[in-house]
């Protein structure tokens, strides 16, 4: 009887622990934040029926974790894009430190059968790194070192041309082999910010839908909350028009939900993944619907709010959590470390 009670108690605690670590409610719904962990600057892409999510690790290495999911709710780490940054001794705690700096805001794309990732250290050596792989669960290879582009978004157009969209509406065309900038290629500012955009405006993510170009950015006007804005144009060089697509607090906190990206599922439904700054907890991602209204990707529910509880986009997937218990009884550390 004692043994049975002990086993029952263990199973109960295990289930409760898993529930606490996962946003999956077990009834076909999930609760936002979809990941209760520090996963800043999310970029999410879909390849077939698989979703991939890359985030920021700053000074921690290996860096730029790649996560995989079948339902956008249950995620697992499958690889890291890079092992170390070696161009400055500060990344090895020599001649100073890089705490709070390092790798920021990776852009993840799938193009012609390969995955590409671009990131810049928010510190020396002020370069940009392009990594690539055919298998996101395997090893990523350094493809090229190109200029530093702040909070950049890779963009591959249908005509084969490649671009980097970065900063506050800047764009630079790249060589077709992604080894540097294309001399004589497109190099311009896509728009001038209006008077309402009087503070932070960054976190570029560009997509193309139905022949239109959409540039999503985080905006943080003075005296306001973080919000997401969208610039759209019929030509990549513009002219662009702007619309606020998400501006709402969440969870009783005064800060808004913004900076991330939008994507579709195999059935053509659209979603957004954007973070909210939770202070010491970090920047936690929230999953929400994205509804196209008059050619604009409007985020949140019908009232423009981030839903607290939402139906999972895909049903029937195994519940998983990024945070795990580890007995350290294997030869290699788990990817969570």
List each language-model region with its residue ranges.
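Bacterial Sec-dependent N-terminal signal peptides
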Residues: 1-22
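Carbohydrate-active catalytic/glycan-binding domains of CAZyme proteins
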Residues: 20-337
């Amino acid at each position: 009887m004692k043994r049975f009670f002990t086993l029952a108690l263990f199973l109960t605690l295990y289930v409760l622990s898993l529930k606490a670590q996962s946003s999956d409610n077990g009834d076909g719904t999930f609760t936002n934040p979809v990941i209760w962990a520090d996963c800043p600057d999310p970029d999410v892409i879909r390849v077939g029926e698989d979703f991939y999510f890359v985030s920021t690790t700053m000074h921690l290495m290996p860096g730029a974790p790649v996560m995989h999911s079948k339902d956008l709710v249950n995620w697992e780490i499958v690889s890291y894009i890079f092992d170390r940054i070696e161009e400055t001794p500060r990344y090895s705690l020599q001649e100073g430190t890089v705490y709070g700096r390092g790798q920021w805001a990776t852009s993840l794309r799938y193009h012609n059968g390969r995955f590409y990732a671009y990131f810049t250290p928010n510190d020396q050596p002020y370069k940009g790194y392009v990594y690539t792989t055919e298998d996101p669960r395997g090893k990523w290879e350094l493809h090229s070192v190109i200029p530093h582009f702040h909070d950049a978004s890779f963009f591959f157009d249908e005509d084969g041309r490649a671009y980097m969209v970065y900063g506050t509406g800047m764009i630079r065309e790249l060589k077709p082999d992604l080894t540097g900038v294309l001399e004589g290629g497109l190099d311009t500012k896509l728009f001038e910010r209006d008077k309402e955009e009087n503070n932070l405006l960054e976190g570029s993510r560009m997509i193309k839908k139905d022949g239109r170009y959409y540039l999503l950015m985080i905006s943080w006007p003075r005296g306001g909350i973080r919000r997401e804005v969208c610039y759209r144009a019929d030509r990549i060089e513009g002219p662009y028009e702007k619309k606020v697509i998400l501006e709402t607090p969440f969870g009783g906190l005064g800060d808004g939900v913004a900076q991330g990206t939008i994507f579709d599922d195999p059935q053509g439904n659209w979603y957004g993944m954007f973070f909210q700054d939770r202070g010491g907890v970090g920047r936690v991602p929230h999953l929400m619907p994205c509804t196209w209204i008059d050619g604009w990707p409007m985020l949140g529910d019908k009232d423009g709010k981030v839903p607290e509880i939402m139906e999972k986009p895909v049903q029937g997937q195994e519940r998983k959590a990024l945070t795990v218990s580890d007995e350290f009884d294997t030869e290699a550390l788990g990817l969570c470390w």
